[in-house]
Design a protein with these regions (language model features):
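Gram-negative (and chloroplast) outer-membrane scaffold detector with strong preference
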Residues: 56-142, 150-152, 188-197
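Cleavable N-terminal export/targeting peptides
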Residues: 1-24, 198
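Charged, low-complexity C-terminal accessory regions
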Residues: 32-34, 99, 126-132, 165-171
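Surface-exposed strand-loop-strand hairpins of Gram-negative outer-membrane beta-barrel proteins
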Residues: 32-58, 137
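Transmembrane beta-strand segments of Gram-negative outer membrane beta-barrel proteins
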Residues: 21-33
Length: 198
């Protein structure tokens, strides 16, 4: 009897370990929209705002979870370009403005939906390298997201992600005319992703 009990305990421990701590790799596709960055304080220009343009971001991530908590490392690429906007104009120059970013995130599960879906909240810093006319601008931002994850089949899962980001202005002082005021650059995005459990 003691041998059977020991065998059951060992079997339970070995099967619970992969569930308790799991590695995932993932692919994300997100629609991003930027705001802030610079504003015409004189109201003398038709286009009163200058900012990164809206773009589609492609990302890869590696994450590790322990039951309720987790960490992730994410890298992404997009080409937002440079946008100028006003009341009756919205122009985007896509010949410049490549964006590379890498972020570290911590997350926690805040709710469950259905038998195996989960809602997580993620927070962390990100480093952005915005290549503006051949000059790479490095900015550190704060990002936060709400993520809904659900199983698709076997080891494959899906995710919907709503993200917000705040960063110092992506323009340097010499990039904008004197009548333009530099402001915080902000971004929000909506994305879909796939997660594969290793």
């Amino acid at each position: 009897m003691r041998t059977l009990t020991t065998a059951l305990v060992l079997l339970t421990c070995t099967t619970a370990r992969p569930i308790a701590a799991q590695w995932h790799i993932g692919f994300d596709l997100a629609a991003t929209r930027y705001g802030g960055s610079s504003h015409d304080t004189s109201n003398s220009h038709v286009a009163s705002q200058g900012r990164p343009g809206d773009a589609t971001a492609v990302g890869l991530r590696v994450s590790h979870t322990w039951r309720r908590y987790g960490v992730a490392l994410r890298a992404a690429y997009a080409k937002p370009g440079l946008a100028v906007a006003g009341q009756s104009v919205n122009l985007t120059d896509k010949t410049t403005g490549d964006l590379f970013e890498i972020g570290a995130l911590v997350n926690t599960r805040v709710a469950g939906i259905g038998p195996s879906g989960a809602v997580r909240v993620e927070l962390g810093p990100a480093l952005h390298l915005w290549n503006f006319d051949g000059d790479a601008r490095a900015r550190v931002s704060a990002q936060g997201a709400a993520v809904y994850e659900w199983p698709i089949t076997g080891r494959l899962g899906g995710a919907v992600r709503l993200e917000g980001l705040l960063s110092p202005c992506w323009f340097d002082a010499g990039d904008v005319p004197p009548e333009f005021e530099r402001r915080v650059t902000w971004r929000y995005s909506v994305g879909l992703g796939l997660r594969y459990r290793l």
